[in-house]
Amino acid sequence: MQWVIQMQYRSFQQAPQAWHHRQRGFSLIEISMVTAIMMLIAIIGIPAIQAYVIENKTPRVAEEIQRFVARLKSHTHGFGTAPYSGVNSATLVNAMRSSTVVSVNGSGTGASVAHGLGGKGSAGQGVITIAPQSLDGSAHGAAFGITLNHVNHAACPGLASIIQRIADVVTIAGKSGSVIVKDMSREPSQPYDALLADEQCISGDRNTFTFTFR
């Protein structure tokens, strides 16, 4: 009986010590496994979140461009055969400076408009540009082109599908160079092809959209 009591007493003394060992925390292997899982979630999740944000922003960017085009056309209506010969980056910057959808970076001749659909939004990447164009043998400046470069594939073909409603020509450069997906300036005309537009987009921020208006 005394032997049993002594054994129980020893077990009682050792119990806190064993409990103390169990409370030391996670092992290095366990911490490494948790870190690896968190990194994997970040690698998979961040691009998916980015694509979701861009996809939802695309209609707002397209509508902002449509408003700009409508204003520019109304301001230059009746200005001869080449009303857009003087359009440049300043034209776009001044019109977009108060926008809550796109952002203007810099000032003066070095200012640029970031579309927010891919790219850095500076240094000529992920920006919107404008330039005079000609269509169907017309004078240079009879039309103008708006280009969005470094666009993420999540904006395709939504961006083209919305803006094409008011554009005469739409081209997409992505998978296989510059491809015309709509051209109403020639005979016979080429209606917009959404499937062709979707096929041209390549994964990542590597797509360029150009819309020509007159």
Model-derived segments and spans:
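N-terminal single-pass transmembrane signal-anchor helix
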Residues: 2-4, 8, 14-61
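Residue-level marker of positions within ordered structural domains that often coincide
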Residues: 12, 73, 161-164
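Generic signature of intrinsically disordered, low-complexity segments enriched in small/polar residues
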Residues: 12-15, 29, 55, 71, ...
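Short alpha-helical basic/polar micro-motif
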Residues: 47, 66, 157
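Membrane-proximal N-terminal amphipathic helix
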Residues: 50-100
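Periplasmic/extracellular, small/polar-rich flexible segments of pilin-like filament-forming proteins
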Residues: 81-214
